[in-house]
Structure formats: C-alpha cells, structure tokens
Amino acid sequence: MSYPNPPPPPKGSASFSSSSSDPFNQTNQLPYDSQFPPQHAFAHPSAPNPGAGGAGVAPPGQGGQYAPYYDNEPEMGGRWEGGGMGRETWASESGWSQNEPNYPPSDYHGGPGYLPSRASTPTFEGSNAGHRPRDPYPAWTVDANIPLSKEEIEDVLIDLANKFGFQKDSSRNVYDFLMIQLDSRASRMSPNQALLTLHADYIGGEHANYRKWYFAAQLDLDDAIGAVQNPGLNRVRSVARRGGKTKNPLATAQEKSLESATSRWRTAMNNMSQYDRLRQVALYLLCWGEAAQVRFMPECLCFIFKCADDYYRSPECQNRQEAVPEGLYLRAVIKPLYRFLRDQGYEVVDGKFLRRERDHDKVIGYDDVNQLFWYPEGISRITLNDNTRLVDIPPAQRFMKFDRIDWNKVFFKTYLEKRSFFHLLVNFNRIWVLHISVFWFFTAYNAPSIYAPSGSTTATTPMAWSMTGLGGFVATLIMIAATLAEFSYIPTTWNNTSHLTRRLIFLLIILAITGGPSIYIAFFNQTGHVALILGIVQFFCSVVATIAFATLPSGRMFGDRVAGKSRKYLANQTFTASYPALGFYPRVASFLLWFLVFGCKFTESYFFLTLSFRDPMKVMNGMKVQNCHDKYFGNGLCTNQPAFALAVMFVMDLTLFFLDTFLWYVIWNTVFSIARSFAIGMSIWTPWKDIFARLPKRIYAKILATDDMEVKYKPKVLVSQVWNAVIISMYREHLLSIEHVQKLLYHQIQSDQPGKRTLRAPAFFISQSEKGSKAEFFPKGSEAERRICFFAQSLTTSIPAPIPVDAMPTFTVLVPHYSEKILLSLREIIREEDQNTRVTLLEYLKQLHPVEWDNFVRDTKILAEESDAFNGGNPFASDEKEEAKKADDIPFYTIGFKSAAPEYTLRTRIWASLRAQTLYRTVSGFMNYSKAIKLLYRVENPEVVQLFGGNTDQLERELERMARRKFKFVVSMQRYSKFNKEEHENAEFLLRAYPDLQIAYLDEEPPRKDGGESRIFSALIDGHSEIMPNGRRRPKFRIELPGNPILGDGKSDNQNHAIVFYRGEYLQLIDANQDNYLEECLKIRNVLGEFEEFKVSTQSPYAAQGHADFAKFPVAILGAREYIFSENIGILGDIAAGKEQTFGTLAARSLSYIGGKLHYGHPDFLNAIYMNTRGGVSKAQKGLHLNEDIFAGMLAFGRGGRIKHSEYYQCGKGRDLGFGTILNFQTKIGTGMGEQMLSREYYYLGTQLPIDRFLTFYYGHPGFHINNILVMMSVQVFMLALVFLGTLNKQLTVCRYSSGGDILPGQSGCYNLVPVFKWIKRCIISIFIVFWIAFVPLFVQELTERGTGRAILRLCKHFLSLSPVFEVFSTQIYMHSILNDLTFGGARYIATGRGFATTRISFSILYSRFAGPSIYLGMRTLVLLLFITLTVWVPHLIYFWITVVGLCVAPFLFNPHQFAIADFIIDYREFLRWMSRGNSRTHANSWVGYCRLSRTRVTGFKRKRLGLPSEKLSSDVPRAPWKAILIGEIIGPICLAILFVICYLFIKSFAVDGQIQPGLVRIAIIALGPIVWNMALLITLFLISVFLGPCLNSYTHQFGATMAALAHFGAVAGMLVFFELLWFLELWNTSHAVLGIIAVISVQRCIFKFLIAVFLSREFKHDETNRAWWTGVWFNRGLGSHALSQPAREFVVKTIEMGLYSADFIACHLLLALLTIPMFIPYFDRVHATMLFWLAPNQQIRPPIYSFRQRSQRRKIVFKYGLLYLIIQGIFIALIVVPIIFKDVAGLTPKSVPFNGII
C-alpha cells in the first residue's frame, strides 16, 4: 500500500451562521433550566454546518492565541495551515465513512490527505475486487427510521473536534465506539429508543453518573438561580441568607428544592431533541476518550464535560469561525491535571522520573482530586492564576479558562490513609463492640470471685449487676476511641468534624450513665436497696447501649450521612452509600444467616469458653506464691506470678472468643451456599439420569433462541449441530480420540423411507443412567468428562432466555498483558530449566496429560503420513517390519515430531502452550466466542445457509461479519513496542492466527529536542493492519496521551489506556492465564441476559410515567465461576485451586444472594457504560490500590450497582504452582488487604452499611484476614500463657485429686492448678478446630459437585501430602504481610510465577525469603514449646509441635527433591558460601545483602545515586513512620523481654540448698556478654584492616573475606561459649537452661531492634561501606562527606550483624538437622516426590544424567562437605550432651558455682 503525501486542504470552508434555529445561542443557561425549550429540528436546513473551518490559526511557534500550548511542544501531526476538517476530508482520511470501518474494500489505497498518524487500512481478506462489504452498523440504517444518519453523526463529531481541539484519531475512535453502541442497542429496540436510552445512561437518566453528580454538587442552584444572585457556588443556607432580598422567597425556595430541580431536569431532558442528545453523548465520549488518568476521576470528568457543554452552547462558541488546533483539549485541559497527579508520586532527578518517598497520607491521589468535585465548596476552591475563582466566571466562559487554572492550589487530602491499626477500630467498631462487650458480660457474670469482698468468693447482688453492666461502659469506651481515631483520618473542617464532635459529647454522656453507678456501688454502697436498683438500671442501660453500638452504623449516629435529608449529605449518599436494596427473600436470608451465626456463637462461647474459664479464674485469683524472694525485687514480683498468668489467660480467652465467630460463619455460610446450590440445581445430587437424558432438550430450550423455528425445523436437527460442534472442538483440542468422537456424535443414517436420511442420537444421552457405562464415551477422570458433565449440569439451572444472535448486544473481552508468556518456545519445552530441574516441561506435561498426548501423537502421525504420501512416500510402508515402525515412532512419542519443519515443531509448541499458563491459551480459549456466535447464527438462521447456496466462502464471510459485529477482543500489551524478537514473533503469530484480535499498546516517540519529554501514544492494531517496511504494523488509531500512563502498579493503568478501544455495552475482564471453552461460550447470550437489559421498556426514561420502568438499580458486575485448571498438578496446585473454588464459587454464591459480593475478580462481566462513567474498571493509585479489582467492586456497590453471580458459566484459570510463588501471591493479597484497611472505601462501608450487610462484608472480606492474624496471635498468646503456667508447675507443689475429682487430704501448702490444666486442653482443642475448619468448605463443595468418593479421596490426598502444614504456614504469611504493611508499608505488585514448580530451590534462597515472615517466629516458638513440654506436658501439645515445626520447615518440606542426599550436601556448600560472600566484592545473593535488606524497612535508603552496580540489588523501600517503629520495633520487643525475664526471675526466686540464685545478673551477663565480646573483636579487626588492608588488598582480593570470616567465626564461638556458661550455671537443669535461653534471646532481640531503630541512619543503596569495613579501604568508595561518619555507623551495624550472624548460623544448622532425619528413611525422596507431584512412582521423574567429570566432581564435593557438615552438627550435639553425661561425675552443686554466687 502506498500513501501519497497529503495535499493541502481547502483554505476555509462555508462560514458558520449563528442561526436562530439553535435555541441555545442567545443564552448561556443549560437546556434543562428553562421549562420548555423549543424543539430542535436536527435535520433543519439551517442547522449549523459542523464542517466549518477557517483560516487564520497560527502555526506552532509563531505566536497567536494558542502559542502557550504549542511553542514548546512538537507538532501533533495534524494539518496546521488551514484550520478544521470537514466530513469529506475526515472520511477520506479515515477511509471508512461509507464502508465498514475496519475493513474498507480491497482496492482502497488511501484517499487524499491521508492522516499523518497513518491509521491502517487493511484489506478484507479474500474479498473479490467488485465486492463491497456489508454496512458496518446494520441496525443503524436509513430503512430503520433512524433519528440521525451516520453522516450527520459524523458531522457532529467533526464539529466538536474543530470546536474543542480533539485529536483526529481520537474522534475517529469515538465515532466507531458510538456507532457500535448505537448499533448494538438498535439491534434489539428502535433506533430512537437506542439513542434515548444511551443518553439516559450517559447523561440524563435516573442512574446516569452525570445527573447524580449534577445534583450532589448542587449545580442546579448555580445554574437555575444564575450568576447574578449566586456569584459563587454556596450552600443553600448562603443563598437563604440573601433570600429576604428577593421579591418572591417562596418561588426561590421552590426553585431550590431538590424535587422541583429533578422535575425540571426530567422535563428538559424529555424535551431535548435527538440531535442534542447525540451531541451531548458525543461530547462526553470525546472528553472521556482523551482523558487518560482523568478517567479515574469520574466527577472531575463530569465537571470538564459540563464546562465544555456550557461553552458549546454559548454564542461565543457558535459564532466561532476558525477551528482550534488539534490536540488543544489534551494540552490545555488534561495535561495540567495529569502533571499534577504525576508530580504527587514522582520527581525529576537528572532527567529521570524517580519515585518520591511519600506515603499515602501525603499523596493527593485520584480519589482526593475527584472528591473535590463532589461538593460546591470544593468546586469554589478552583482558582485561576490571577486568583479569580472559576465559579465567579459565567458558566459558558469557564471552559476557555481551563488553561489558566492553578491546580496546585486547589486540591487537598480528603481522607488520610495513615498507617495505623486504628483503622481497624474505626472501620470495624461494631465487631469489637459485639465481641469485647459480650465477652465482658459473660466473663464478669461468671467471675464473682474477682470483685467479691476480701475473704469471700461470692459478690453482693448489686455488685454483680453493676460489674456485669460495665459491658456497656466498655462498648462506649470502644466507640469513643473509634471516634477520636476518626478525627485523625478526615480533614478537620467544620463540615466534617461537627457530627463527630456531636457524637463524642453524646458518647461521654452514655459513658457516665454506664460507668458512673459502678463507682458509687463499689466504693460507697455494695448492699443497699438503692445500689441494687442502680445496678439493675445500669445493666439494662448497658445492654441497650451495647445493642445500639453493635448494630447502628457510626455514620448514622448524630448527623446521618446515609439517609439524612439535608442537601449537605447528598454527595456522600450518592457516591458512597447508594447501596442497592435487597429483595424481600434475600434480606430475610441475610438476617437469618447472622441470627444463626451469632446464636450458635454466643451459646457455644458461653458454655465452652466462659464457663470453662470460671474455675481457673476462681483458683488463680488471689493465689499468692509463698517462700519466694529475689535479690533485687524482693517478693514483689514472684508472689504475683499467678496474677500475671491469669492476665495472659484472659487475653487468650478473648482471642478465642473472636475466633469462634469466624468458625460459625464458615459453617453456616457453607450450609447456606449448599442450600442455594440445591435450590438452583447446581449439585451432583440432582438425579444423574435426568442431567444427561434431558440434555438435548435443554440445549434446544436454553441455548438456542428458537421461538418460531419448531414449525420449520425439528429440534433434533438444530441440537445435533450444536452438540457435534462441541464434541469436534474437544477432538481438535486432543481431549477425545477418534473412537470416542464416533460414539458421541449425532450420525446421519438411512431412514426407513427410501431416499431419506435421518439423525441418530448418540447412545451417550440414554446410557448415562446405566451404571458403569460412562467410561466408554470418554477417558475416566479426563478433562473432556469434566467439561461435558459441567455443561450438562449447568443447564439444569434456571438461566435467562437467549435472544437471536443479530439482536444480542456487542461485548468486548479485554486482557491486560505485561510480560506473561505468549507462546512457549521449543527450547523452553524440551530443555531443563537449570541444573536443579530434573525434568523438561514437555516430559512433565506428558505425565500430567497422558491421554491428550497420545491423541496428539496419533494426530501428528496421520498428518505426517499424509504429507509423506503427498510427497511421494512409499505406499507399501505398512508392509515393513513392525519393529522398524516402532523405532520410527519414538521421536513422535518423545517430542511430538520427527521432522524439524516449522509446521511440526509449532504443533508441539502449541500443544504445550495450551496446557501451560500462556497468553496463547487465553486468546484461543476466548476466541471461542467468535466460533460460538457463528455457530449459533448458522444454526438459528438456516435461511442464511440456503441464501448462499453452495458458496461456502460467502457464507463464511457472512458469519465472520456477524461474529465481528457482536464480539471484540482487545489485548492490552503494555510492552508491545519494546518486545524482543521472540516476543514480537509470537505476537505476530497470534495476529495471523486470529486476525480479528486487536492489540492496544503504548507507542513512544523520543523528544524532538534535548531535555524535552517523550511523546507517548495509545495505539491499536489488529491482524488486518498493514505491515510496514520495518516489520511493525500500521496502527488503526494512534491517540496521544498527556504523558506516561503507568503511574501506579501497572495493571490498572494498562487497562485504562486501552479501555478507549473497547466496543459495545459489556466488558469481560480476563487475566493472561485463563482459558475458555466452546460449550461455555455458547451460553454468552444467557450470561449477558443477567444484566436485565434485553427487554427494555418502550417508554422514554424521561417521560413523566415512563421513568419508573428505569428506576431499578442497574446490574454493574456479573461474577462468574472459575475452574482452576492446575488443580491436579500436585498438592500445592490443588491447594491453590481449592482456595479459589471455595472463595470464587462457594462463598460467592451465598454472598451474591445476600448482597455482599464485592470481589470483582476475573472472569467477571462488567456493565461497561456504568463502570466507565464511574471511574473505570479498576483503581490505580500506586500501592494503595494494589488489589485493583476489588476497589471497582466496592465503588460499584457504594454507588448503587448490583453485583450478581452466575453459577452456570465458568472459565478456566491458572494458579501458581510452586511454594514460593503461591506465597508470593498470598503476600500480594495480604499486603493488598493491608492497603484496603487504610482505604476510604473500607471507611465508608464500615461506618455506613446496615448491620447484616456490614457483617456480610466484614466476614466475607477483611474478616478472613483478621481471623488469620487472630489465629496466629492465639498461638503466641497461648505459648506465653503456658510459659507462665510452666514456671508455676515447675516450682510449686500442685494439689493431687482423687479419681472422684476431690482434692486428696494431707497436702498442706499445695497449689490447686488442676482446673488450669483442663483449661489448657480445651484451648488446644479450640485452636485445633479453628485451623481444621478451613478444610470444611472445600470438602462440602467437592461433595456437592463431584460426589462422596471424589470428596473423600481429595481430602485424603491433602492430608497425606501434609497440606495442614502448608495451611499453618500460609496463615502466618497472611498475618505477617498484613501487619507488615500496616506498620511499614511497601505494598507492591509481586509478579507471581506462572510455570510448573519442578525445580529444587537452594536452602539459602528459601531461608532468606521466609526467615523474616515465618522461620524466626517458628524457631522462637519452638524454644518456648520445648520449655512448655518439659514443664506442663499434656498429650494435646503434639498438635502444637506439628504446627510449630511446620512454621520452620514448610518451605523446605515443599521443595522438590529436598531429600536427595547428594543435592542436600551440595546445597549445604552453597549455604556456607552464601553465609560468607559479599565482603570482598559485591554479590547479588549473600547473607550480608539479605541482612541489609531486612533492616531497610526501618532505616530506609539514602537518595539513589545513579551509576553504582550494587544499587540495583535493592528496590525502593520507604522509611517507616516513627510511631510504627516505636510500637512495633521498640515497645513490643521490650514488653516481651520483660515478660520472659519475669518468668526466669520467678524460677530463680526459690532457694536451692538454702541459697537464692541471682537471676537478673545472670541474664544480663549471658545476654550482653556476646555483644561486648563482638565489639572487642570488631575493634581489633578494624584496626588490623585499616593499617594492613590498603597494603594487602593489592596482593589478594580475599583480604576482606578473610577478616569477615575471622569475625564471624569468633562471633559464633563467643555465642556458644556463653551458652555453655549458662548451661553450666544452671547445673544442666534442662528446663531452667531453656527458659534462660528464652530470656536471653528476647533481651538480645530487644537490644538489636533498639539499636537499629535509634542509632542507624538511612542505608546507602550500594554496599560500599560493608566492603570498606572489612578491607580497610575507605577512600574512593563514593561516600563523599559521609566517609568520616560511616565508620562509627558501620561499627554499630557490624555489632548487630555479628549477633545476627551467629543466631542465623545456629538456627540454620538446627533446621538442617531436622531436615536430615527423613533422609535416613530408604526411598524417602521418592515418597516425597509422590507427595508433591501426585505422580505414581513408576511415572516419576528420572534423576538427571551427568557426565563422568560432573559425577566425579559431585562425589568430591559430597565427601568433603558431608564430612564438614557432620563435624559441625557433632560439635553442636556434643555441647549439649557431653555435660549431661559427665554432670554426675563432676557432682556439682549450686555452691560450687564460681564467683561466690554473684552470677
């Protein structure tokens, strides 16, 4: 195709006359302000000619009106010499006015003046020279009585583009966008109604966001009253103040009332001409189409549109002669806003954009900017550069002042997302009230001994009433704390804080009422009649207060933000609290669910938790320990040890009180969900015979739109085509062999009547009722069986009826893509990943899909034989020997091809790609929509087939046209223009395979001059786009953006830039690792029917009566099921699949019914107009909106959109398969949830939802994560309680009981701790149940969908594969990631793996990844558990041993081939290297690097200095706020250290052989000794390195490493010496020594954290200081002025590092010892592999094949390092065991301890 240079356009066209036919050219008022504007004649001969243009626009750089925008900018690429464009030039440029937009005739070569952006003009493949394609918008033709022709619509867009300076490509894109929407609607309603409803959805209807915003921001006052009386936008009261001066106050008030304003609005909308309606929609879409990041701010966009609309109707605009330059709108309106948003997060350093170190509460984000436009006060803040307020300018002139707005002065934070745990208090205050207050009521009533008069165990009646009644006091305290915290999250303006202040005053009064009587009763009158009355009244007041606070949303107390009638609350109600109402039955179900949950919870908690705690409280309260004494504290601490223990037990009981609510929620939610599945017929327990026998009838009734067809065609004929297409599609995917296909197809057979043929149905439908016959039709347990069963089962449910294909709405599938695999390369398939991988990908896939591989090979062989025969192969080959044939087949069965010709290798690549998580799989799966639409169109319209006779090409073209019209597929390939050669080839392959696939990508043009910014474009290509000489395709549209659109975490920005290319009414958002199937795609019309827009009322949405038909809340999101296709790929894949199954299906089913489904994950369908007018399909602030999709769900829910769930449609979805990648995903979800807790959406939902929906929201979303925190917290608190109880049990004489349960006589001085031991057992059972309840939903889901056998088998496989260990570990990861995020921040997108986890990961990598989140905690808990086991052993503790060991070893347990002996030893060598490297030269993976990185979340980094390679090793981590550091890093560890030291001091407070032992001094010496020793060692080595280093470094590069090795060896030795000293001082009393170690660890941890938090300044990004310390070379390190201060800082760092090094060294060897034990079991590695991969031992992965040299090398390494490993482990064991053996020989006593008992 050649593109001639465009000729100059005509200089000035017809002049524009300001005709009186335009009702809006005399006034600047909105059309809906006058009661009855005159009817606009849209086809009037004197209507404005939008093709006007004029000369006189200054070219860029030559001054003139627009010079400020263009002098420093490169040209847009438009035509500068002569103003605007007319339709004829626009049409000829785009080449698609008269013909199909994307597919002009093949002889078209670009008309005159072809667009500079070079929009593509692909040829219509295969079209004949004389063939003109059908009309692209068949429902919008002159025959259909359309209100405006395509040409008139085009004119409108050209006119708007000329008036506002929209880009040509953007205008063309919007034209196509708008026409497809009109065509989509007009295909099922009249064209007039289509335009009317479209205008109602975008601009004026009941649910249009623009209309809602218009009234919320009180613009009706601004517009109706006019600029004279109301110069600024003020509140109603401001106008009312001047109301007395008006002549008719009543009329003014009437004008101002909301009802009269909405009535005026409706009248004006009803009277508006269709021309104006179209113009408004077109203008809105043009504003939206170039808005870029402003699309995330829907109300800001509404404001821009309002100003543009006002300006358009002004005489100034209508009389304008010349067209404004192209791109003016982008530069004057969008770019300043974009720059403001960009500069919030980034700053320019050395010409590069660097992320600012700001947390969310300092960043004015999209939501803050958007919220400014909600309120009149916000809009009135907008000022120009000369400080004029924009609202003081007449509405019609505001748009032209946008370039002069100073946005930096306008915006402020509207909600402060501070990192704080108080968000949990504010957002979920009702949860805390409900639990803590009720816990108080239960416990206070059952603990009379605590508040009884001294000497008595029973309290007086008034005291009992009053103390129990303090539950209300507690509830009020929680509410006061929540209110005070709320003050810190919202800006303190009077409007915000007035209702908070009112609430606070009221709460203080209630506090006095619920707490005051207790003071009187407790201190003045415990027994009187008045006291009793006061106590009872107090109790009932408390109950009322508790119920009120637990049920009423705090946003509705004292200034109702949700339902208040005041106009000042309207914006809040409109945008945050327009919750869609539930129907009667769902509401009843919602209340019933929570009544059952809390009914069971409170009953069970009272009897199981509270009553069981009664006896321990009774015996522990008042218990004082006798005969104990401490050297420094006397008996002040030790006598109160039972009180400390009781306090910790209280916290434990309260934690369990929270946990069992979630347990009951899981149980009842599962019951409800299963009941729903039976109600809608989605269960295997529906009669099996019924499912298959009736399948043909159901296909006919539910899949086909066959209202009037039965007369002409038998249902069997139609159904057979659909069924055969499904079966053949499975055959093509190699799921079925040819034999299976023959049995499953409908066959044509000879009829009884001569010359006629009839159809025979497959026996499959009938024989399904006969047991045992299923296996004949498809392989047992195969993918084909699963798909056919689900298809049959899904059609038993009630589903919306389909409408004919040509009437169905158009929809788009959108897939964001970054760097996911497009197609696997041959190298990836047939080569191992690295030396730690034992299997190629193809081998692994063949073992996972043996039947499919077999079918594929058979298929390939047939192909090869045909090819051979065609090429003249031997026709008698079949007579040759069978052996030779078998040998010939080997290559087919091993790699899938024999000839390396591309067509054969490509087949193998595609086969593997369709079974991995690739984009090709996604595209090929979702392109089935196109096949389904063609199939349905052909089946339902047999006359179309007859029309084309035998011309299959023309028939295919007609089917293609219909599919293309109804379905679009856009992949947003963010990196497309930066793809490497292989990626580009793969993308090109996709486009050739699927020419209708569209790819949106970012195209970058370098700056024209130095120091300028690159220009970035949003471009679109498809498989029809012309290929240019450079190999790239010519874009169809290329729209300039204001700057780089990727400002956030990437995904939402990627979706947002491509969203302008979607088409139609609905969007399906898909991830690049999903799949779809033909039989599911056949249900697309039923699925779209769920949006309830197929049968639209014929009334006008604006008519006085008709608007009621449109009052229903629209469906915003339709959720769909996901089948996780990685479910059988070993235990981890199955766990990931199980979680998705339970959350995505089981929970979603019940949540959507009771109106609590928020989660919009993929593959959900979206109402595109609804979502795009409300901020788009996801939110995009970096970090805060990490889980971008759920925010779209919350946004839609809060603004009145319904969220439904579809049970009968499901897509495939891939999940992460490796331990690390699954936990990366969970970390991402956990940190994302932490960010959600900070967000304003949670604030609005938590403080405004009614109680039943609030509970559904809480337990369905954040409750799960908070429950994980509480589960792990309960383990920690319980361990602490048991340590205290262990010290009591160890040191005190415990009373013994008889078998009858009575205390035995003659036990003076004993302590009754038996009730406490019973409580311990009950607690362990509770924690055990809470952990294991996680498996119930999966089991029940499997039971209902696949039957008892499959459910039991799956559960057994999980338990045998140690899945509970993984569950414990993942719970800890969830907890760590949330708490870490709430404390330190740093949430970021973690790219999770999409491959198969077959590679063994080295110990050091796993340790460094999981030490912080879990292993350290596990190791500390292990030491606690050892002490507990030694002092309070009960068999129930075995469960805790499994749990805690799981926390330590889970990462290694799920590591492939962890227990192969040779690999283990070689890995040990790698571990020792990891511990020691990075001190002489930089290394990317070293212990010192890991240590630096783990402390940077506290210290933060210094500013980035470009150029040093080691800087790349660390990512940006913002420094944590000091409050977070104070609580998390200083106060927390100090408290723990104090508690453990108290425990140690207690056991040392009893005299042994008459001698009191000095506990405190001993702990101080053992804890501080190693630190002092390390300091001395460091100073010595520092002096050596400074004096010798500069000389010796020139001789050896190992000097630094040697010094570091000496220091680290000394540190480990010092640690062991001091441990041995403790062991000796305790005289080898194991439990005492273990408790001593616990206390020492806690003290050292406390010291190190304190040093890091207080003494360490920010880290350098590079590691020069570390290497300078060891090598002694401090110059030339790039330290600059820091060279003098760094040695002192580095001394503190090295002191900490030495302590941590020795701790890590010992901890790692303990872990390695635990992992060594299973290796003594023969064949354990094989058993372990079976457990991980679920492959039978005979299918297992072969060991790798090594060369002779490699084998010899490995043997040497194994021998050398194996010996070293045994020696080190032997030393550790000897240090513990040898003293025990010789202690009796030595005969030591306390008196033989040296230093005369000082230590």
From Swiss-Prot:
Subcellular location, record wording: Cell membrane
Composition bias, Low complexity: 12-23
EC number from the UniProt entry: 2.4.1.34
Comp. bias (Gly residues): 51-64
Positions of region (Disordered): 1-136
Annotated keywords: Cell membrane, Cell wall biogenesis/degradation, Glycosyltransferase, Membrane, Transferase, Transmembrane, Transmembrane helix
Lipid bilayer topology: Multi-pass membrane protein
The reaction(s) this protein catalyses: [(1->3)-beta-D-glucosyl](n) + UDP-alpha-D-glucose = [(1->3)-beta-D-glucosyl](n+1) + UDP + H(+)
The UniProt record lists the keyword Transmembrane helix: yes
Similarity section: Belongs to the glycosyltransferase 48 family.
Protein name, UniProt field: 1,3-beta-glucan synthase component FKS1
Native species: Cryptococcus neoformans var. grubii serotype A (strain H99 / ATCC 208821 / CBS 10515 / FGSC 9487)
Phylogenetic lineage: Eukaryota, Fungi, Dikarya, Basidiomycota, Agaricomycotina
